[in-house]
A protein has these predicted regions:
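Membrane-embedded alpha-helical segments and adjacent helix-loop junctions characteristic
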Residues: 30-127, 256-346
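Generic signal for short, ordered secondary-structure residues
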Residues: 100, 104, 139, 230-233, ...
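Signature of multi-pass transmembrane helix bundles
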Residues: 1-53, 159-292, 311-313, 385-410
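Hydrophobic alpha-helical context, especially transmembrane and signal-peptide helices
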Residues: 5, 32, 44, 60, ...
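Generic hydrophobic alpha-helical membrane-segment signal
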Residues: 2, 90, 97-99, 134-139, ...
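Hydrophobic alpha-helical segments, principally membrane-spanning helices and signal/leader peptides
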Residues: 35-38, 45, 94-96, 131-139, ...
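C-terminal transmembrane helix pair
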Residues: 113-114, 121-161, 166-196, 323-410
């Protein structure tokens, strides 16, 4: 329901700003908006088309893991934690393994593996859903974990900083890790409070503290490396783990006497079906965002409004130059990336704004895109509190990113 109102607002606000632009002499504003609808529709289809091969690959691998029993082993191992965080999911259900695979892939920055395993988890949770058009509590918790974007290896951002000539491309690594950890913890806490989950249970509390300790160790470890070593280690570790997972599933299938090839084909067929199913949802959300951006509402209403408010309060407004990246990130990953690159180009990669833009880019994920793809894959229309919890987690990540940037670079 919330997503419905947001989508309508994109078009209404865009039309109002287009009328204002026309009265100020911009006779091409309506053409820009209409062109954006065609471009966004084409982009949505191309994204879905690009996902088809990746979905087929990873859902095929996951099907091998299911038939070999690997997913069930993961589910049993994670049951003590996940049965408390997802209390509506039966103990030792295979979806626990899929959720773990998705979270692990996100943490390693393996987007190509994260989306297919996430969609598989959604399909498994939908099988438990008694109201097929309404999001369940476990679905919402799972999506908030995705939108908060906990990533421990922001390889792409570091590569962009290096290409723009940053003196120390890796100097944003620790701030990104800290900001994304805050966003993830905030997402878990907010959603748990909404769903009345007791996060003070010893097992959950120990897990959250363990997660903080793990991130702390990662921060310390990478802090001992120079930038070249760090880039080499992150790339090598990511790809070794990815290939190791594939090999593990295949060998497990062979050991259990599963027809590995047939199992892969069976799962890959599901990937094609899923890719087709999400096209309407992607078109809807990307066209809405495209119209909103093309009308100028993003710059004139949001960015300038925040800048004016901050200045009126007498606060330091240095961070405002990086806000386009933060505001665009929940709406569009490619749009936010473009804003980050533009900030580094205009202000410099080693400027406060340039660094903060990179932290924004790495601290959260594309909330509306994730909601559209994941809910669309199982035809969920009533998203309940998913949007609110996801955006609150994003807000926590943005506030943390600003505070951390002032501590490190202010």
């Amino acid at each position: 329901m919330v997503l419905n109102y947001i989508w309508i607002a994109f078009f209404v606000i865009a039309f109002i700003f287009a009328l204002i632009g026309l009265m100020m002499g911009d006779t091409t504003i309506f053409q820009k908006i209409v062109d954006s609808t065609f471009d966004s529709s084409k982009n949505a289809f191309e994204i879905s088309l690009g996902l088809t091969g990746v979905l087929a690959l990873w859902l095929g691998i996951m099907k091998i893991g299911e038939k070999a029993g690997v997913v069930n082993v993961l589910a049993r191992a994670l049951s003590p934690v996940f049965t408390r965080l997802f209390p509506d999911i039966p103990k030792n259900h295979p979806v626990m393994g899929s959720i773990f695979m998705n979270i692990a892939s996100n943490m390693l920055g393996l987007d190509n593996a994260a989306t297919p395993t996430g969609l598989k988890a959604m399909q498994q949770m939908q099988e438990l859903n008694t109201k097929k058009d309404t999001a369940t509590n476990p679905m919402i918790m799972f999506l908030v974990l995705n939108t908060s974007g906990l990533t421990i290896i922001p390889t792409t951002i570091l590569a962009f900083r290096a290409s723009y000539g940053a003196a120390q491309p890796t100097d944003v690594f620790i701030p990104i890790l800290m900001a994304t950890l805050v966003a993830t913890l905030a997402g878990i806490i907010i959603t748990s409070l909404w769903q009345r989950i007791n996060i003070l249970q010893p097992v959950l509390l120990a897990t959250l503290l363990g997660m903080c300790a793990f991130v702390g160790i990662i921060i310390w470890g990478f802090g001992q490396m120079d930038k070249d070593t760090m880039n080499t280690v992150t790339t090598l570790a990511s790809n070794m783990i990815l290939l190791g997972i594939i090999l593990c599933f295949i060998l497990a299938g062979f050991w259990k006497k599963v027809n590995v090839y047939d199992a892969f084909i069976e799962g890959a067929k599901e990937g094609f079906t899923t890719a087709v199913k999400i096209i309407p949802y992607l078109v809807a959300i990307l066209v809405g965002i495209g119209v909103f951006r093309a009308s100028g509402a993003m710059d004139n209403m949001v960015i300038q409004g925040i800048s004016w408010s901050v200045e009126q309060c007498g606060l330091n407004a240095d961070f405002v130059g990086a806000l386009p990246t933060a505001i665009m990130k929940p709406l569009s990953g490619s749009g936010a990336r473009g804003m980050m690159l533009e900030a580094m180009k205009n202000y410099g990669p080693d400027s406060f704004v340039g660094r903060l833009s990179c932290i924004f880019q790495g601290s959260t994920d594309t909330t509306f895109y994730i909601l559209a793809v994941y809910f669309g894959s199982v035809s969920i229309r009533n998203t309940r509190h998913a949007v609110a919890c996801g955006l609150l987690a994003d807000l926590a990540g943005v506030i943390a990113a600003i505070a951390i940037a002032y501590i490190f670079f202010g």
